[in-house]
């Protein structure tokens, strides 16, 4: 990689760190190409990205970003997983690491918060933003449905009473 390419890569990675909702750093030593391709495709399907970068370049790219506190994690063979949704990258990395012992979560960052490996794992257990929206919408709709049922119930009961009186009068 030439000097100009390195500068361009650092600039691109710096923008990624600034725009990402969360960044996860993990070791991938011993992972096969097929495993890495599978990991990348799962991350891409979830809306995230996985990059392998030189540690020195990643540390330079971290300067001036909110995630600057994770620069000490870049030792050995590291990969960077990131996404705009704060939950996506940790969730995919932790799920993939469960089935593959070659991927070891080191830590990460969410905004200005630096996370250790346990922090990333606990973040991965949270529901995604879309799941939270769906739950909130369900909570909002439930009372309205119940109110509509309560309001409609007396009217239907009155209709049944009038119907019973009408049938009684017809029979008499």
UniProtKB/Swiss-Prot annotation:
One GO location term (cellular component): ribonucleoprotein complex
GO biological process, one term: translation
Keyword vocabulary terms for this entry: Ribonucleoprotein, Ribosomal protein, RNA-binding, rRNA-binding
Family annotation (InterPro entries): Ribosomal_uL10 (IPR001790), Ribosomal_uL10-like_sf (IPR043141), Ribosomal_uL10_bac (IPR022973), Ribosomal_uL10_bac_type (IPR047865)
GO molecular function, one term: large ribosomal subunit rRNA binding
Function recorded in the entry: Forms part of the ribosomal stalk, playing a central role in the interaction of the ribosome with GTP-bound translation factors.
NCBIfam families, A to Z: PRK00099.1-1 (NF000955)
HAMAP family linked: Ribosomal_uL10 (MF_00362)
Quaternary structure and partners: Part of the ribosomal stalk of the 50S ribosomal subunit. The N-terminus interacts with L11 and the large rRNA to form the base of the stalk. The C-terminus forms an elongated spine to which L12 dimers bind in a sequential fashion forming a multimeric L10(L12)X complex.
Family from the record: Belongs to the universal ribosomal protein uL10 family.
Name recorded for this polypeptide: Large ribosomal subunit protein uL10
Organism, scientific name: Rhizobium rhizogenes (strain K84 / ATCC BAA-868) (Agrobacterium radiobacter)
Gene: rplJ
């Amino acid at each position: 990689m030439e000097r100009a390419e390195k500068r361009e890569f650092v600039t691109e990675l710096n923008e990624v760190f600034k725009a990402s909702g969360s960044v996860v750093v993990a070791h991938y030593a011993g992972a096969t190409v097929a495993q890495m391709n599978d990991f990348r495709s799962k991350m891409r399907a979830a809306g995230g990205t996985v990059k392998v970068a030189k540690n020195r370049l990643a540390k330079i790219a971290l300067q001036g970003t909110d995630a600057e506190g994770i620069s000490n994690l870049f030792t050995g063979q590291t990969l960077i997983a990131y996404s705009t949704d704060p939950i996506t990258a940790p969730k995919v990395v932790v799920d993939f690491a469960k089935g593959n012992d070659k991927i070891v979560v080191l830590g990460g960052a969410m905004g200005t918060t630096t996370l250790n490996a346990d922090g990333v794992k606990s973040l991965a257990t949270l529901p995604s933003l879309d799941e939270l929206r769906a739950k909130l919408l369900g909570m909002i709709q439930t009372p309205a449905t119940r109110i509509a049922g309560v309001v409609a119930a007396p009217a239907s009961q009155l209709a049944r009473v009038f119907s019973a009186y009408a049938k009684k009068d017809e029979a008499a």
